[in-house]
């Protein structure tokens, strides 16, 4: 079939299959430290969750749990609406 995995005979010459390096599971910093809060009025906290292009960092990269990722997304969108965070990449943070 077309969707089968390649066997060792079908793999190109070059040795055995390479393994991915082990990465430790990221822990949600808001679950780990209960005193941290997510607030749209704190752009310095939210800055860690947006890229230099102004996009929201996904959960698999930031390590947040799904509940806190939703809160961060809402807070970033509110801060953008109030011009506390940049919408595009050519704006600078205060």
UniProtKB/Swiss-Prot annotation:
GO cellular component: cytosolic small ribosomal subunit
The entry's keywords: Ribonucleoprotein, Ribosomal protein, RNA-binding, rRNA-binding
Segments for region (Disordered): 1-24
One MF annotation (Gene Ontology) recorded for this entry: small ribosomal subunit rRNA binding
SUPFAM superfamilies, sorted: Ribosomal protein S18
Pfam families: Ribosomal_S18
Ranges of Polar residues composition bias in the record: 1-11
Single GO biological process annotation from the record: translation
InterPro entries given in the database record: Ribosomal_bS18, Ribosomal_bS18_CS, Ribosomal_bS18_sf
PROSITE patterns: RIBOSOMAL_S18 (PS00057)
Subunit structure, interactors included: Part of the 30S ribosomal subunit. Forms a tight heterodimer with protein bS6.
HAMAP family: Ribosomal_bS18
Protein family membership: Belongs to the bacterial ribosomal protein bS18 family.
Job of this protein: Binds as a heterodimer with protein bS6 to the central domain of the 16S rRNA, where it helps stabilize the platform of the 30S subunit.
Database matches in NCBIfam families: S18
Protein name: Small ribosomal subunit protein bS18
Protein source organism: Pelobacter propionicus (strain DSM 2379 / NBRC 103807 / OttBd1)
Lineage, highest ranks first: Bacteria, Pseudomonadati, Thermodesulfobacteriota, Desulfuromonadia, Desulfuromonadales
């Amino acid at each position: 079939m077309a969707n089968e995995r390649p066997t060792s005979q079908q793999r190109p010459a070059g040795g055995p299959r390479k393994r991915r390096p082990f990465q430790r599971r990221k822990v949600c910093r808001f679950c780990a430290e209960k005193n941290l809060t997510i607030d749209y009025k704190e752009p310095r906290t939210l800055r860690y969750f947006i890229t230099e292009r102004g996009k929201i960092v996904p959960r698999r990269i930031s390590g947040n749990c799904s509940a806190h990722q939703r809160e961060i997304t809402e807070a970033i969108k509110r801060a953008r609406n109030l011009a506390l965070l940049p919408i595009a990449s050519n704006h600078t943070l205060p």
